[in-house]
Amino acid sequence: MTKFIFVTGGVVSSLGKGITAASLGRLLKDRGLKVTIQKFDPYLNVDPGTMSPYQHGEVFVTDDGAETDLDLGHYERFIDINLNKYSNVTAGKVYSHVLKKERRGDYLGGTVQVIPHITNEIKERLLLAGESTNADVVITEIGGTTGDIESLPFIEAIRQIRSDLGRENVMYVHCTLLPYIKAAGEMKTKPTQHSVKELRGLGIQPDLIVVRTEYELTQDLKDKIALFCDIDKASVIECRDADSLYEIPLQLSKQDMDDIVIKRLELNPKYETQLDEWQYLLDTVNSLDGKITIGLVGKYVSLQDAYLSVVESLKHAGYPFKKDIEVKWIDSSEVTDENVAEILAEVDGILVPGGFGFRASEGKISAIKYARENNVPYFGICLGMQLATVEFARNVIGLDDAHSAELDPNTPHPIIDLLPEQKDIEDLGGTLRLGLYPCHIKEGTLADSIYNETEIEERHRHRYEFNNEYREQLEANGMVFSGTSPDGRLVEMVEIPSNDFFVACQFHPEFLSRPNRPQPIFKAFIEASLNHQQSK
């Protein structure tokens, strides 16, 4: 029987519910249990795929092509599992599906209501998360804050699931804030008490409370929270602010959080607590010596969460070299051919990540040109690959008006063009080339030495692709197409062998990087950047 754990949050948003859920998932996985995890988002968008990065941050893509919340990236990196489309459920997706059923007549003319129709749809998606993965435990984070009107249907659904499945199969974890009042010199439990009171008013009694705090929680404070919130004293867990997110699983383990959950849900773990690998990772993070500076050239840099997985992947790639990665955030709208040398003078490597739209694209092209001409390690992802081919066509071949058809529909030289299967698609949401696809690596290339495999699989999110009409011209002038789809039709990787490191890919390798297992192309980029730094 699959067990279900629900993680809610109170007092304020951004408490770290996602990190708490991911950390618990890691602890249970290390005990030999099969874990999956999902996020309920109360917004009415069907998915974040068409949302502005300024609004939502990064869109994280799963193997099966779901466009999801960035928290799923935390889940995958912490627990070291690959999630699926059932791992992110939005209110928009739920309502959309219910309304489609109503239009089809599935409800036989009945009145469609939040209870039972919306709540039943939510519960169905809960169960699918477990069934699709054959998990022992499903951990579900409820987005928003307890009491928010948007999340009430989700709260009601997880209340009902306890009756549906039995109390022994369901557990509620509530995250709260314990604020420190500087003038009084003490921490206050009242916000936590009121948050739990609100949750209980909605029919849910938490089994475990995780308290976010700046300072150590005294036993008296734990006893007080346990008394007023009606839970066991041992079930009040402290989660202190930490220098590294990777400290959190160890914090929770020291307070026996995994043992409490295992006992409460009558789980049968295969192993005792095993955190040697995680402790080694944390020791590595805490012993980094020196830094490598990477210039990240993008147009959403004012909200760094827009590139969250890219930054995390860079950090992972620095660990084997015991180096901290310092990201220099460069707004591509401010980069020109005239100032690019000054802006990028101090960086050890240049990365142009994915993106959409014409705005600020010329600044990215200027940065790519600087990297190519000055032999600075360059790594392009998605749009970063597309613009690398545009820059090469313009400045090496001499096709001055070359561009991407996405960015300039009237260009006489569409180096990047719409995928054939995208020609007649009008909707924006969910219509990109999404998910895991194979890539064939050309023997003897830098890509070959990076991956050491003839075929790899990587996650994609794009609508435009390199135009093969220009392949011979670019190859004749020194660009190598080192990765393609197995049929050779779609370009997946390009490189310039005359440079020490100039590699770009159409896929998004950042979605498969892990802190204990850096993604190969990121690791190679960081190694090249380190060599460049040492050669200065």
Swiss-Prot record:
Binding site for UTP: S13, K188, T189, K190, P191, T192, Q193, K224
Reaction catalyzed: UTP + L-glutamine + ATP + H2O = CTP + L-glutamate + ADP + phosphate + 2 H(+); L-glutamine + H2O = L-glutamate + NH4(+); UTP + NH4(+) + ATP = CTP + ADP + phosphate + 2 H(+)
Residues holding CTP: S13, D148, I149, E150, K188, T189, K190, P191, T192, Q193, K224
Keywords: ATP-binding, Glutamine amidotransferase, Ligase, Magnesium, Metal-binding, Nucleotide-binding, Pyrimidine biosynthesis
Disulfide bond sites: none
EC number from the UniProt entry: 6.3.4.2
Ligase recorded as keyword: yes
Residues bound to L-glutamine: Y54, G355, L383, G384, M385, Q386, E406, R463
Domain Glutamine amidotransferase type-1 intervals: 293-535
Subunit structure: Homotetramer.
Further comment: CTPSs have evolved a hybrid strategy for distinguishing between UTP and CTP. The overlapping regions of the product feedback inhibitory and substrate sites recognize a common feature in both compounds, the triphosphate moiety. To differentiate isosteric substrate and product pyrimidine rings, an additional pocket far from the expected kinase/ligase catalytic site, specifically recognizes the cytosine and ribose portions of the product inhibitor.
Function: Catalyzes the ATP-dependent amination of UTP to CTP with either L-glutamine or ammonia as the source of nitrogen. Regulates intracellular CTP levels through interactions with the four ribonucleotide triphosphates.
Stated family: Belongs to the CTP synthase family.
NCBIfam families linked to this entry: PRK05380.1, PyrG
PANTHER family: CTP SYNTHASE, CTP SYNTHASE-RELATED
HAMAP family in alphabetical order: PyrG
Identification of the protein by name: CTP synthase
Protein species of origin: Staphylococcus saprophyticus subsp. saprophyticus (strain ATCC 15305 / DSM 20229 / NCIMB 8711 / NCTC 7292 / S-41)
Designated gene of the protein: pyrG
